């Protein structure tokens, strides 16, 4: 490696990358990144970390199961029963396998799992050592090798997936799409994604100011032991507010109190120190205030010292804490023991849970108090909850590890219960039978299938929506879904702060892509080059620091701290160092050489506060930046040349990182670097803005996410428009995946003739938007022509539509399976007959074949039967005597959706997991654009089709070009989507030039002036205006019209799926009002506001008809004397009111059924509404 470097020592200046070369060079670097990483690497790496490290760690951390039978009181001497020890050791994960009902294993391919509704999972095996210890004999050890303990769902395209490392050709043979990124699971045939969950970083001290509470300031530390199942235990150190509710009259100044886990009341901070064994005031102050020459701070601590003056010994302090515990011990010894336990195990567990951690804990606690005092004195800024460096993202790895830990614990519990039963009877037990494999398999499957993250039994406590069904509308929507982030804040909270775009999100999270409405700003998406760390062990770093003259906290005198720099590793204070500058340089050098330190570790030096923080934990969001030294990029031309030939020389992104040219910087470290936006900023100028750059952006357009990268010229649009397009781009039709013909998706839209856009951004290459586009380049004119394009509607060219413009096909799949409910109830596919079947609908059963399934190619329409299925009726005792039962079966067939028509496209019959017959049927229907369908450009300019004119009625240019779409000029000024206009110009140039136009954001090489000049070179008007002729009259239209090719998308909202009306139809059982919703053929609600309007109109009869006659009319008989509903038998014309013994004076009242129901419900609660007839 060194020889190569020496050869390269020739003239450095020739090797620099010139700014004009940089335009191409940066994209070569970006391409190498995506070639190696892909777009879902953060999901795959996290899952691999779980399989390779976490599972083994969880299994090893579990204590061995120690069993002993209860002593049997036999006659004579009592012999010591044998002890059994079970230890779980090495784990093995096999390839994804499926066992058929006959028990034959076969490798399971993902597409088979999708089609047969199976779970794509791999079996997990473990070595178990069983030791039998009998008194007086030597212990007997038996190894149970590779015992099956459950199945783990496998993420597609991860290391353990069967598709990993296959070529495109192999993938095609397996019916998989080579472009599919993976990163999701297949659970019962449906694709599930794990959404990254945001949380506050653990083990870090935060100080916040409290408003309107008894505290002025609070410091908190959510402390969590690395890789353990223990819940986080939080400790708060707070300063009471002046004259607050909690202030005692006698106490002068502001006291400082701590809230400890499992201790009900707050404990004065000095008492906590004394309980840790630091008794003298001087000792305590040395741990809090490192510099005794600081009178202000000493003054702040004085009230706290005065308060704790009464308690001077450690045991008294421990007793003070113990007596405030959850259940205080009876004796003093018990209370002291309890307090010791809490301080050792529950307070700040990340500092240490073993014995003799008191010094470290005292220092950390002192640090917390010190930070609190600094904030109170205004010497240090308060922390920011929304700073992204204070956040961690839980991806598949940590989420699954959390679940697996719980499941494994349950498994061990069950094994213990099972084995104990046998041992108590004096027998040995069978290990294979003791392990309930369903616990792990079903537990993981349940959480992934429902999204309730946690134990099934405590479903209400679990987080909901962690796992979601992968969105397969467009390829972009799939990619975007795999890179989504979620903040678990209640959606109903009207808090603006967490929803706002924070400065620290630059380059990490897309600024445009977030949903509108209640989840705005809480659901985010990763920027293109952002990556989430998977976490590494801090031990090598700690060892390195030991060698590099870091002084341990146990060994120093507290006075030394004031001048030295504190070192934190993952939030835990490990020591101090005298020469921080040199230490940081060494650490950086090591990280860039990828020696000892992994490239995703972040190192922050806070010079003002004299702290160095090193983080190696999982879930930090980071991104690659180019390293600058002495105002020059370390990336040289030779690197670019090697990357250009990466097909031949295997030089990749990884080599760039290894040669120390690029490094990953996370949000916290980003605040300590000086970033140049382009290498141009590094050039020597007369007035240098900055001469200490340390890093340079690769390309500023990488701050955008998947959906925003598809927008051309997003830097020329008003920002909410980019947000609207990011949402609409996910609903556009296109080819969502190349193997759609072999998939049986519930819903799928496929465009007939998708085109790649004439105007693209460079980022689109990596999103595969050219291979799987979702739209058509249509000629768009901006004009008001006949007025049928007002209010965001568009006029379309009927002739173009007839030629296939924006025509699409819609697939819907139906699934059904046979099963056995009881011993006599079984469901079977067959063609039901009216003679033997009960409950058959008025529908056409003739299209079914004899096996009960419809044949492919048959045309079907609403309410036709597509799967015939019957269930045998159970035989009642009474019917056994009479031999001739009319009905032996009940019909439970599947019908086509009411409002749909189509042709049966494909029928698949197979066996499911239980070995029952199982079928899926796919129906296709052609959707031709019609009035009311929704279209949109790539700039948030959505519109519906207002009318379609034939080609001869459309305006035309002198060249004979007619537009496909005419949009209204009013759509532009107020929305300021200038990108839409520039795209049109650029598209016009591209069409003439015959090459794809570049519309990458923040690109100085392309501007409107340059495009306009090119356009005028081709003989067009500078700004794209043309003379148009009226299609109806043939006359010249007086004004010039802006016309050119613009990329349009057809969205999934179509009139055929929404049109709905009802005259009469089904009603609800309870209140006899019409059903709700199109799928149930429901009514249209005449709501409160509509009612108010009719009252204002004075249209009383109409109002009565809507709210009564057309809804739920009903007749009630009412007793004239008491006004309560009477008993009426209309057949025999007998009426009576039992209460009044009245049979004659009864009136008939008409009222809504809902009103009658309300009166009866009130009566059931002993309120009597009386209807007095006048």
Curated annotation (Swiss-Prot):
Keyword Nucleotide-binding in the entry? The reply is no
Q: Which PROSITE patterns match?
A: RNA_POL_BETA (PS01166)
| Modified positions (N6-methyllysine) in chain numbering | 1052
Question: GO annotations under biological process?
Answer: transcription by RNA polymerase II
The note on the cofactor says:
Two Mg(2+) ions are coordinated by both the catalytic residues and the nucleic acid substrate to enhance substrate recognition and catalytic efficiency.
Q: Which InterPro entries match?
A: DNA-dir_RNA_pol_su2, DNA-dir_RNAP_su2_dom, DNA-dir_RNAP_su2_hyb_sf, RNA_pol_bsu_CS, RNA_pol_bsu_protrusion, RNA_pol_Rpb2_2, RNA_pol_Rpb2_2_sf, RNA_pol_Rpb2_3
Q: What is its main location?
A: nucleus
What does the UniProt record say this protein does?
A: Catalytic core component of RNA polymerase II (Pol II), a DNA-dependent RNA polymerase which synthesizes mRNA precursors and many functional non-coding RNAs using the four ribonucleoside triphosphates as substrates. Pol II-mediated transcription cycle proceeds through transcription initiation, transcription elongation and transcription termination stages.
- Can you name this protein? DNA-directed RNA polymerase II subunit RPB2
Q: Which source organism?
A: Homo sapiens (Human)
**Taxonomic lineage of the native organism:** Eukaryota, Metazoa, Chordata, Craniata, Vertebrata
């Amino acid at each position: 490696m060194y020889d190569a470097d020496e050869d390269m020592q020739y003239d450095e200046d020739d090797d620099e990358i010139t700014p004009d070369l940089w335009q191409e060079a940066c994209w070569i670097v970006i391409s190498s990144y995506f070639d190696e990483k892909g777009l879902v690497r953060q999901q795959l790496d996290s899952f691999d970390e779980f399989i390779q490290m976490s599972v083994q760690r969880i299994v090893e951390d579990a204590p061995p199961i120690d069993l002993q039978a209860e002593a049997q009181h036999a006659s004579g001497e009592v012999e010591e029963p044998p002890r059994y020890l079970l230890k779980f050791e090495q784990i093995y994960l096999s390839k994804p396998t499926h066992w058929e009902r006959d028990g034959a294993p076969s490798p399971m391919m993902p597409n088979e799992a999708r089609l047969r509704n199976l779970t794509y999972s791999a079996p997990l095996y473990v070595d178990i050592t069983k030791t039998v210890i009998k008194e007086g004999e030597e212990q007997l050890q038996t190894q149970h090798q590779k015992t099956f303990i459950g199945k783990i769902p496998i993420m597609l395209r991860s290391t353990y997936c069967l598709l990993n490392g296959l070529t495109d050709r192999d993938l095609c043979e397996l019916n998989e799409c080579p472009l599919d990124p993976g990163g999701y699971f297949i659970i019962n045939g449906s694709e599930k994604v794990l959404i990254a969950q945001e949380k506050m970083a653990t083990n870090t001290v935060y100080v916040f100011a409290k408003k309107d509470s008894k505290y002025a300031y609070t410091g908190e530390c959510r402390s969590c032991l690395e890789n353990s199942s223990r819940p986080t235990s939080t400790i708060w150190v707070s300063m009471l507010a002046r004259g607050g509710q909690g202030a005692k009259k006698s106490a002068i100044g502001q006291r400082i109190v701590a809230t400890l886990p499992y201790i009900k009341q707050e404990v004065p901070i000095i008492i906590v120190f004394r309980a840790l064994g630091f008794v003298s005031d001087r000792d305590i102050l040395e741990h809090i205030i490192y510099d005794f020459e600081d009178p202000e701070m000493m003054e702040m601590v004085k009230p706290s010292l005065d308060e704790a003056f009464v308690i001077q010994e450690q045991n008294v302090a421990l007793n003070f804490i113990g007596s405030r515990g959850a259940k205080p011990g009876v004796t003093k010894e018990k209370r002291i023991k309890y307090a010791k336990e809490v301080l050792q195990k529950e307070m700040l567990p990340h500092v240490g849970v073993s014995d003799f951690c008191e010094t470290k804990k005292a220092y950390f606690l002192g640090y917390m108090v010190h930070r609190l005092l600094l904030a109170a004195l205004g010497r240090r800024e308060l922390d920011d909850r929304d700073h992204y460096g204070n956040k961690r993202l839980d991806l598949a790895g940590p989420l699954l590890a959390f679940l697996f830990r719980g499941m494994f614990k349950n498994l061990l519990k069950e094994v213990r219960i099972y084995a104990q039963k046998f041992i108590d009877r004096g027998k040995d037990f069978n290990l294979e039978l003791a392990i309930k494999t369903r616990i792990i398999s079903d537990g993981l499957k349940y959480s992934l299938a429902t999204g309730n993250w946690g134990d099934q039994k405590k479903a209400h406590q679990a987080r909901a929506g962690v796992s979601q069904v992968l969105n397969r509308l467009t390829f972009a929507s799939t990619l975007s879904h795999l890179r989504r982030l979620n903040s678990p804040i209640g959606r109903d909270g009207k808090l603006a702060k967490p929803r706002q775009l924070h400065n620290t999100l630059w380059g990490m999270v897309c600024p445009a892509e977030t949903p509108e409405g209640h989840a705005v700003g809480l659901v985010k998406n990763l920027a293109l080059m952002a990556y989430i760390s998977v976490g590494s062990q801090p031990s090598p770093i700690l060892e390195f620091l030991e060698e590099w003259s870091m002084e341990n906290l146990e060994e120093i005198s507290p006075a030394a701290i004031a001048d030295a720099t504190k070192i934190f590793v993952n939030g835990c204070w490990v020591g101090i160092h005298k020469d921080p500058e040199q230490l940081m340089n060494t650490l950086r050098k090591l990280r860039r050489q990828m020696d000892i330190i992994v490239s995703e570790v972040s190192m922050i030096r806070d010079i003002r506060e004299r702290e160095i923080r090193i983080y190696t934990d999982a879930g930090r969001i980071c991104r690659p930046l180019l390293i600058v030294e002495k105002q020059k990029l370390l990336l040289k031309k030779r690197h670019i040349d090697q990357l250009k030939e990466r097909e031949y020389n295997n030089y990749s992104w990884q080599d760039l990182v290894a040669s120390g040219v690029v490094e990953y910087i996370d949000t916290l470290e980003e605040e300590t670097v000086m970033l140049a936006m382009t290498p141009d900023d590094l050039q020597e100028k007369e007035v240098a803005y900055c001469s200490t750059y340390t890093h340079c952006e690769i390309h500023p357009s990488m701050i955008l996410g998947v959906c925003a990268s598809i927008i051309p010229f997003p830097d020329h649009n008003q920002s909410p428009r980019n947000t609207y397009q990011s949402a609409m781009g996910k609903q556009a039709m296109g080819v969502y995946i190349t193997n759609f013909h072999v998939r049986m998706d519930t819903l799928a839209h496929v465009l007939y003739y998708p085109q790649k856009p004439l105007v693209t951004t460079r980022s689109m290459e990596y999103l595969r938007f050219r291979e799987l586009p979702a739209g058509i380049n249509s000629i768009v004119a901006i004009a008001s022509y006949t007025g049928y394009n007002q209010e965001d509607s568009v006029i379309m060219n009927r002739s173009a539509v007839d030629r296939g413009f924006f025509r699409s096909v819609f697939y819907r799949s139906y699934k059904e399976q046979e099963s056995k409910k009881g011993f006599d109830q079984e469901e079977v596919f067959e063609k039901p007959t009216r003679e033997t079947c009960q409950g058959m609908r008025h529908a056409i059963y003739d299209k079914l074949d004899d096996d009960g399934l419809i044949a492919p190619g048959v045309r079907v329409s609403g309410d036709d039967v597509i799967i015939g299925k019957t269930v045998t009726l159970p035989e009642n005792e009474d019917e056994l005597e009479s031999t001739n039962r009319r009905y032996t079966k009940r019909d439970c067939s599947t019908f086509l959706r009411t409002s749909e028509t189509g042709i049966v496209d494909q029928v698949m019959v197979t066996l499911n997991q239980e070995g029952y017959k199982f079928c899926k049927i796919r129906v296709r229907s052609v959707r031709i654009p019609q009035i009311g369908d929704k279209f949109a450009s790539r700039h948030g300019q959505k519109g519906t089709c207002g009318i379609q004119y034939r080609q001869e009625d459309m305006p035309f240019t002198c060249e004979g070009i007619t537009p496909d779409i005419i949009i209204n000029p009013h759509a532009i000024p107020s929305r300021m989507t200038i990108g839409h206009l520039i795209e049109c110009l650029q598209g016009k140039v591209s069409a003439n030039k015959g090459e794809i136009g570049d519309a990458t954001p923040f690109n100085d090489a392309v501007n409107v002036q340059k495009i306009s000049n090119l356009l005028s070179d081709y003989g067009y008007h500078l700004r794209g205006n043309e003379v148009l002729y009226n299609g109806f009259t043939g006359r010249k239209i007086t004004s010039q019209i802006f016309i050119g090719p613009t990329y349009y998308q057809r969205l999934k909202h179509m009139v055929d799926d929404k049109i709905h009306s009802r005259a009469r139809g089904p009603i609800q059982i309870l209140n006899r009002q019409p059903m709700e919703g199109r799928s149930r053929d429901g009514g249209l609600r005449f709501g409160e506001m509509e009612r108010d309007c009719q009252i204002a109109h004075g249209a009383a009869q109409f109002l009565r008809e809507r709210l009564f006659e057309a809804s739920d009319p009903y007749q009630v008989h009412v007793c004239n004397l008491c006004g309560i509903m009477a008993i009426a038998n209309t057949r025999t014309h007998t009426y009576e009111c039992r209460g009044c013994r009245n049979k004659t004076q009864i009136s008939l009242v008409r009222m809504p059924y809902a009103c009658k129901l309300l009166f009866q419900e009130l009566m059931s609660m002993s309120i009597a509404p009386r209807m007095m007839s006048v």
